[in-house]
Amino acid sequence: MSDRVPIRTLPSGVPGLDEVLGSGIPEFSFNLIAGGPGGGKTTMAHQIMFKNATPARKAVYFSIIGEPPIKMLRYQQQYAFFDAAKLGDGTVRFIHLGQQALEGGMQKVLEVIEQEIEKSAPGIVVVDSFRALVRSTVAAGSGGERELTDFMQRLALVLTAYEATTFLVGEYADGEHDSAVFTVADGLIWLYQAIDRNSVVRKLQVIKMRGQGQIPGLHTSRITEAGYSVFPRLLKPAEVVANLPLKHRISTGVKGLDEMLGGGIPSGYSVLITGPSGSGKTVLSNQFIIDGAERGEKGIVAIFEKRPSDYLQTTPRGAEFEKLVREKKLEVLYLRPLDLSIDETLLELQDAVKRIGATRAVIDSLSGLELALAPTFREDFRESLYRMMGALTGLGVTIIATVEVADSYIDLRFSPEPHGIAFLTDAIIIQRYLEIEGQLRRALAVVKVRSSQHSKDLKEYEISTEGGIIVGQPLTGYEGLLTGTPKGGENGK
């Protein structure tokens, strides 16, 4: 029998943050939200406060030196989490201590905070910004980091004694993690903001959170009209990948291709369709989705190069897709911002899968996904794609991903350089252009199906006027088909 006393946690109200923290915010903990200007510290503090403030657990927001409350509220009210009713009934109160800080320094500020805590007994306390306090006292000829450390220790004792969950907001440069004031805190959340070319990338790190097993490392974040959001980084994809039986196979919807795959795609596999522009990658993936719908299986399509309306108008079987969308059998996700991260993309896909109960997914295309990512994330594209594929197949989803490659016949390459992503998928289907007897023709082949037998034939195919792929006969009797200019053939040419 365990003698441990469980620590109650509070929800942060910040999507994704509780998962990174391990289990929310420990009640009565003393926390620091730190980082450079513009990182979202004040927004996060407000979001946490409004989430947890109730008539039984009131909140007080102390602002020091920085923005007066009226100015701060003017901007914070734009976010969806802002609740004006909590201001009206006194559940949330704002107190500006700028004058006290200028006249009496840290000692006076501490006295006022202690008096207010004793009087109103709030359950949530925010102090913004404690770093501005030390700057003001230093400018006045007294104080410094040592005095700030003493201030922090005394403040922590007071707030802990009154059982308040506390958040201190402070501006620190990225390299200042070793400040003595951080030893006082139970939790330390660090917010980063970096500019990479023309993209702004936000990241969050939980440096410590006592009593909880947080997810280490940097996690992508974003500020929108809804507030601050975090996209947790999955560490070990293998832990979420389900072991699915190979005997359970699903159809591609393309007659002849299922036989080439050895009876269809094993359920829960990821398939890469690679080929040059216009070879029919999207056509094939559309057939896969439509076939699933006809069998009662819902699907999602993630697109990066066209808006959904344009995609549905130009895709070969757009009318059928529109019908499936109306019937809620299909969801088309448009993910095109030029500062995406894989984790943000994965969250969108996972939410869509769970929302409609999808078992089939198409990513069209990986080339478009790479372009949509912020430059800093392209460096880890292969690793990130591995995590994304593992997470989705772990949900029991069968994936088809398309990728465009130059139709170079010097070597047999399945994905564009420098990433080499072909080994990340369970099966590969290649599409090629061939020049035979003065005509431009198309051929496809199954290069691999992991742990399964498959056809070794290279077969010609056509794209019908109805927008479907029709697989023909094997191209026998030729030599050098993959060079683009084959010789021979059944007629001996």
Describe each model-derived feature in a short phrase.
Residues 65-70, 78, 98-103, 131-133, ...:
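Conserved nucleotide-binding/hydrolysis micro-motifs of P-loop NTPases
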Residues 28, 55-58, 88-92, 163-164, ...:
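Short glycine-/polar-rich loops that comprise or flank the Walker A/P-loop
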Residues 30, 35-37, 44, 48, ...:
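Scaffold/interface architecture of coatomer-like assemblies
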Residues 1-8, 111, 118-120, 193-251, ...:
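Conserved P-loop NTPase
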Residues 31, 107-184, 188, 341-428, ...:
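P-loop NTPase motor core
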Residues 48, 171, 175-179, 190-193, ...:
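Short beta-alpha junctions and helix-cap segments that line functional grooves
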Residues 31, 36-101, 266-272, 276-343:
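Conserved P-loop
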